[in-house]
Amino acid sequence: SFFDDALSAGPFEFLIAIGFSFEYLLTNLLFVPFMSGASFNGDLPTMTFGFSAQSDESRHMTLGLEAIKFLLEQDEANVPIVQAWIDKWFWRGYRVTALVAQMLDYMLPRKVMSWKEAFELYFEEQMLGGLFQDLAFYGIRPPMHVDDAIAEKEILSHQVYWTLYQFSHAAAFTTTVPDADAQNWLSENYTETFDQLYRPLWDKEAKNIEAGGRHFVRGLPQLCQVCQVPMLFTEPGDPTTLCQRESVYNGEKFQTCSNGCQWIFEREPEKYVQAWLPVHQIYQGN
C-alpha cells in the first residue's frame, strides 16, 4: 500500500514519499543493518545486492533532500505543506520497517545488530540528529508521532514476530521458537522488556510444542486501513494493551493501528476508504 499511496499522490508529495521516506528512512534501516547481517551469516549474494543497492540509495537520498530544500526555498507558504507530507510519510515508512525489525532480531541465525541498536543509530542519531538539524533552518521540525516510534523500539520486533509466528499458515513465513541462545541475546539487548513480556510467551509455546501442539491463530487478522499491517501494535506506553483507533466516514467505521495511521486516515479519508484489504477480500471470497 506504500507505493500505491505514493503513486496516487501529487508529484511533489511523491518526491517526499520516495526521496525522503523510502530512500532515506526505509532503505537505511533495511540495506545497511540487515545486509550486514547477511554478510555476517555468509550470505554473500544478498550482501552484494544489498550494498550495491544502498550505494544507489545514497545518491537518491541526496536528490530527495535537495528536492525538499528546493520546495522550501520557493515560498514560506510551502513549509506547512511540506511539514505535513514529512509527518505523513515518516509514519508510512516507519510502519513498513516493522518487518525489518523482526528480520533483524529473529530471522538471522547469527545476530549482528538488534533492531533497537539499528533504530538508534540510523534514525535517532543520523536522521533526528543530522537531517532534521539541517531542515530546522527552513522551519521544519521532527515528524509528528516520532515519540511513539521511539517508544516502540523496545517492543516492535517482538510483537511483529510473535504475530507472524501465530499466522505462519497465512503469511507463508517459516517461523520457529527462538532457542535458548537467541532468547538470551534478546534478553541482553532488550533488558527492559524481553524477560518481562516476551520470554514467558516463548516458554509457554515451547511447552505446547513438547506436548505436540504448536498453536496457530485460526482465522485472519484485522488489518489497518492505512498501513495494511495487522492490528498487532500496542498503546503508547502500555505494551500489554492492543492499540485500535476507530474513525467514522460517511456513516461507515474504519479501523487503524495507531495514532499515526488514524491521523493520516482522517486527513484524507476519501482516499483510504478505497483501500483494497487482502483479508477483507479473502472473507468476501474474492
What does each of the following model-derived ranges do?
Residues 230-248:
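Short recognition patches in nucleic-acid-associated and regulatory proteins
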Residues 228, 258:
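Cys/His-coordinated zinc-binding microdomains
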Residues 231, 261, 265:
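Cys/His-rich microdomains that often coordinate metals
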Residues 265, 273-281, 285:
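Short, intrinsically disordered terminal segments enriched in charged and Pro/Gly residues
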Residues 221-224, 244, 251-254:
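Residues immediately within or flanking Cys/His clusters that coordinate Zn2+
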Residues 218, 227, 245, 281-285:
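Soluble, non-membrane globular domain cores that form compact, hydrophobic packing
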Residues 1-223, 230, 237:
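Non-heme di-metal
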